[in-house]
Regions:
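Peripheral, non-AAA+ core regions of ATP-driven protein-machinery
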Residues: 1-131, 135-138
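A short beta-strand-to-loop transition that corresponds to the Sensor-1 phosphate-sensing loop
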Residues: 43, 217-219, 244-245, 258-263, ...
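Conserved alpha-helical scaffold flanking the Walker A/P-loop in AAA+ ATPase domains
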Residues: 121, 180, 191-214, 247
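Walker A/P-loop
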Residues: 125, 130-171, 236
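AAA+/P-loop NTPase substrate/partner-engagement loops
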Residues: 150-192, 247-248
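AAA+/SF3 P-loop NTPase mechanochemical coupling elements
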Residues: 182, 205-211, 242-261, 289-293
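Conserved AAA+/SF3 P-loop NTPase catalytic/coupling segment centered on the Walker-B
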Residues: 185-189, 201-235, 266-270, 290-293
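Substrate-gripping "pore-loop 1 plus following alpha2 helix"
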Residues: 198-201, 228-250, 269-289
Length: 293
C-alpha cells in the first residue's frame, strides 16, 4: 500500500523540493524506532539519508516529480542507490567500526611532554576525564586538540548520531569517523554551553560533544555556576533542556578535558620564569574549582 511512504522536503516557490537541516534528524529518530521504512525526498536529502540502515529512499526533485511518483506503478525507478561509508573498516565482534588514517593534527607535532602524552593515551583508552596543569605554552592545548584522533573507532550508530547533531547545529554533515571536539571559550554564556533559548530548546556545547571531547581551556576562568552545572552531565551522561514549548533529553557521553595554569601568572612550574604570585593567590586561584568537581 501507499500509506507506508513518508514525504520530506521544503517546497520552493518554483516547485523544487529542497533539503532542510532537520530532515536527517527526524528520519534517523523515526528509523531507530522502526516507525518508517520508505522515505521520499530530494536528491540532496537522499545523499544523507542513504547512510541510515533498513530504510528505502526514493528521489523526487520537484512537485511534478512527486505527483508522477504517486501515480507510478514502478516506484523502484525512483529508488536511491545507497553508497557505503568510504573509510577504513575494523570488524570486531560482529560489528563494523570505521576510522580515518588522515589526521589534521598529530601527536608527533608535540615536542617532549612524554608524561602528558602518556596520560592522554590512558584517557583515550579508558574514556577518562583529563585535567592538565602547566605553564603557558607548554603544549596543553596542542595535546587536547589531538586527543580526538586517537579515540576508539566509531560504529555506524555513533557516526549517524554525530551527523544528526551536526544537522541540528546547522553544520554540513560529513559522516567522517572522527569524534567531535568542542572547545567553548571561558566567556561563553551558560545557555551556549548547556543549551537553551527563549522558547524552543536548542543544543549547547555539552550535547554537541556527545561521544567525543569537550575541552575547557583556562578552566579556573570559567564561572563557578558553569563548572557546578557541568557535574550533572558528567555524572549522568545526559542533560535535560526545558523551555516553554519543548523538553528535550540529550545524551552527554563525552570525555571532559581541561587545562589550567598552576597559578594566576602561570609561571609557578616554569624553569625559565619566576612566579610572582603569593601562596594566598595560588590557593585562591585553585579554590575556584570545588572539591566535588
Amino acid at each position: 500500500g501507499f500509506y507506508n511512504f513518508f514525504f520530506f522536503g521544503e517546497l520552493a516557490l518554483d516547485g523544487t523540493i529542497k533539503d532542510t537541516s532537520h530532515i536527517f534528524a527526524i528520519v534517523l529518530s523515526l528509523a531507530k524506532k522502526g516507525e518508517l521504512k520508505k522515505v521520499v525526498t530530494s536528491l540532496e536529502s537522499a545523499k544523507k539519508l542513504g547512510n541510515i540502515p533498513n530504510i528505502d529512499v526514493y528521489i523526487v526533485n520537484t512537485l511534478n516529480n512527486a505527483i508522477e511518483f504517486i501515480k507510478s506503478k514502478e516506484k523502484d525507478n525512483y529508488l536511491y542507490e545507497k553508497e557505503e561509508i568510504k573509510y577504513e573498516v575494523l570488524n570486531l565482534k560482529d560489528e563494523q567500526y570505521f576510522y580515518n588514517k588522515k589526521y589534521d593534527e598529530d601527536f608527533k607535532d608535540v615536542i617532549g611532554q612524554d608524561m602528558a602524552k602518556y596520560a592522554a593515551l590512558i584517557c583515550a583508552a579508558g574514556n577518562h576525564n583529563f585535567l592538565m596543569e602547566g605553564s603557558p605554552g607548554c603544549g596543553k592545548s596542542m595535546i587536547a586538540k589531538r586527543l580526538q584522533y586517537i579515540l576508539t573507532p566509531m560504529n555506524l550508530g555513533e557516526i549517524l548520531e554525530k551527523a544528526k547533531l551536526q544537522a541540528l547545529d546547522f553544520k554540513d554533515v560529513d559522516f567522517s569517523p572522527i569524534r567531535a571536539f568542542r572547545n567553548p571559550h571561558h566567556s561563553s554564556t551558560k545557555s551556549s554551553i548547556f543549551g537553551g533559548g527563549s522558547s524552543n530548546a536548542k543544543m549547547g556545547e555539552v550535547a554537541l560533544s556527545n561521544n567525543g571531547v569537550l575541552f575547557f581551556d583556562e578552566l579556573p576562568h570559567f564561572p563557578s555556576n558553569i563548572l557546578e552545572a557541568l557535574r550533572e552531565p558528567l555524572e549522568d551522561n545526559k542533560i535535560l533542556i526545558s523551555r516553554v514549548n519543548s523538553k528535550i533529553l540529550y545524551e552527554t557521553k563525552f570525555i571532559f578535558v581541561s587545562a589550567m595554569n598552576p597559578c594566576p601568572c602561570g609561571n609557578k612550574l616554569s624553569s625559565m620564569k619566576e612566579c610572582r604570585c603569593s601562596d594566598f593567590e595560588v590557593q585562591r586561584y585553585k579554590n575556584r574549582l570545588s572539591e566535588p568537581f
